[in-house]
UniProtKB/Swiss-Prot annotation:
Name of protein: Large ribosomal subunit protein uL15
Gene Ontology CC, one term: cytosolic large ribosomal subunit
Gene for this chain: rpl15
Gene3D superfamilies according to UniProt: 3.100.10.10, 4.10.990.10
Subunit-structure text: Part of the 50S ribosomal subunit.
Keywords: Ribonucleoprotein, Ribosomal protein, RNA-binding, rRNA-binding
Region feature Disordered, mapped onto this chain: 1-31
Domain of life: Archaea
PANTHER family (alphabetical): 60S RIBOSOMAL PROTEIN L27A, LARGE RIBOSOMAL SUBUNIT PROTEIN UL15
Any GO BP: translation
Length: 140
């Protein structure tokens, strides 16, 4: 909007001298009037109000470190090279407790004979490891 044509007038198109002074001209600052006179506009724009969902207390929730069986199958030779796993009886023996991994999940393919020690296994991970001739040892 070209403002040159408003120059010389007292309020330059801002209405009366009382307008364009503070937030009262705009119905408040920020979210003021959010559940009152601004509510209908906000409803059509899709704003959400109020609390939603549930947060677990920090002492209950924790992050579980995981690895997939497909990744284990690929990493087994490298773990032996690094001294983090060993080969006994034609099987890769991997202790995931030493690596800080708590659970094994079943995504991927298992082609090698793996003997895995871990705190937890998903049903599909246990099934795939045992189908390839390996075994799952639950660490307690």
């Amino acid at each position: 909007m070209d403002t040159k044509k408003f120059r010389g007038s007292r309020t330059c198109g801002g209405g009366t001298h009382k307008n364009r002074r503070g937030a009262g001209n705009r119905g408040g600052r920020g979210k003021a009037g959010a559940c009152k006179h601004h509510f209908v506009r906000a409803m059509f724009r899709g704003y959400s109000y109020g609390k939603h969902g549930f947060n677990l207390p920090a002492e209950i929730s924790r992050d579980v470190s995981i690895v997939n069986v497909g990744e284990l199958d690929e990493l087994a030779p490298y773990l032996v090279e690094e001294g983090l796993a060993e080969i006994k009886d034609d099987a890769y023996h991997i202790n995931l407790e030493n690596l800080g991994i708590e659970k094994v999940l079943g995504s991927g393919r298992v082609m090698k004979n793996l003997v895995v020690t871990s705190e937890g296994f998903s049903a599909s991970a246990r099934e795939k490891i045992e189908a390839a001739g390996g075994s799952c040892i639950d660490a307690e």
